[in-house]
Swiss-Prot record:
GO terms for cellular component: cytoplasm. InterPro entries: Alpha/beta_knot_MTases, PUA-like_sf, RsmE, RsmE_MTase_dom, RsmE_PUA-like, tRNA_m1G_MTases_N. This is Ribosomal RNA small subunit methyltransferase E. GO terms for molecular function: rRNA (uridine-N3-)-methyltransferase activity. Belongs to the RNA methyltransferase RsmE family. It holds the Pfam family Methyltrans_RNA. It catalyses: uridine(1498) in 16S rRNA + S-adenosyl-L-methionine = N(3)-methyluridine(1498) in 16S rRNA + S-adenosyl-L-homocysteine + H(+). Coiled coil: none annotated.
């Protein structure tokens, strides 16, 4: 049986024992039904793993003994910041989960003119928390030991105006360049913009051009927003990252 991987939000360096977070304790004790003496693998976002053993377990809390600390780097050398216009239903959750599995480092939910999702500030805050939990669960599943950040919602034009040394890319069905024709990726990585189901407006496309985005083509077919993001990330990781290594 595979040893369960559990995220711990506080640094475990130099710790010999700790209580799991409330969410983790509930998962371990109630869902997995694990008891004293069973093994876990903890990670705290530092790119290390911590073999651990349960020493106390009840309905309210789980206490573990830390048995060691090991560097376990599963990160791609290609840094990808995904700017994803929020989509309806479970599509956004699916995109976040699979993007994390494919190696994205940061995800910023975006609002655009044709975005069909309308949420007030309180509901959006709850969504961000939910999406961060999905990112954590994806790391637990895929073996990553650094949890990607889910940033607060931004307007598309504000996100496009940010400059962090990354190559800015925007998918466009009539672009003249493909991912294969891109130059060497800079040390700042890639800032990848994915629009909503309705695409970007003419004004938003003009804004991306003004902010230095390169339009790229991803095949001859029109892809749904959740397909486009995952296809683009996969292609980038194959050409410039660690897929296929």
């Amino acid at each position: 049986m595979r040893i369960p991987r559990i995220y711990h939000p506080i640094s475990l360096e130099n710790q010999t024992q700790c209580y799991l977070s409330e969410d983790a304790a509930n998962h371990v004790a109630r869902v997995l039904r694990m008891t004293e003496g069973e093994q876990l693998e903890l990670f705290d976002g530092s790119n290390h793993i911590y073999p651990a053993k349960i020493i106390e377990s009840n309905k309210k809390s789980v206490k573990v003994e830390i048995l060691g600390r090991e560097l376990a780097d599963k990160e791609s050398h290609l840094k990808i910041h995904l700017g994803q216009v929020i989509s309806r239903g479970e599509r956004m959750e699916f995109t976040i989960q699979k993007s994390v599995e494919l190696g994205v480092n940061v995800i910023t939910p975006l609002w655009s003119e044709r975005c069909g999702v309308k949420l007030d500030a309180e509901r959006m805050d709850k969504k961000i928390q939910q999406w961060q939990k999905i990112a954590i669960a994806a790391c637990e599943q895929c073996g990553r030991n650094i949890v990607p950040e889910i940033r607060p919602l931004m307007k598309l034009q504000d996100w496009c105006a940010e400059n962090d040394g990354a190559l800015k890319l925007n998918l466009h069905p009539r672009a003249h360049y493909s991912i294969k024709t891109l130059p060497t990726i800079p040390a700042g990585g890639v800032r990848l913009l994915i629009g909503s189901e309705g695409g970007l407006s003419a004004q938003e496309i003009a804004q991306t051009e003004q902010q230095g985005f390169t339009e790229i083509l991803l095949g001859k077919r029109v892809l749904r927003t959740e397909t486009a993001s995952l296809a683009a990330i996969s292609a980038l990781q194959i050409c410039f990252g660690d897929l296929g290594e």
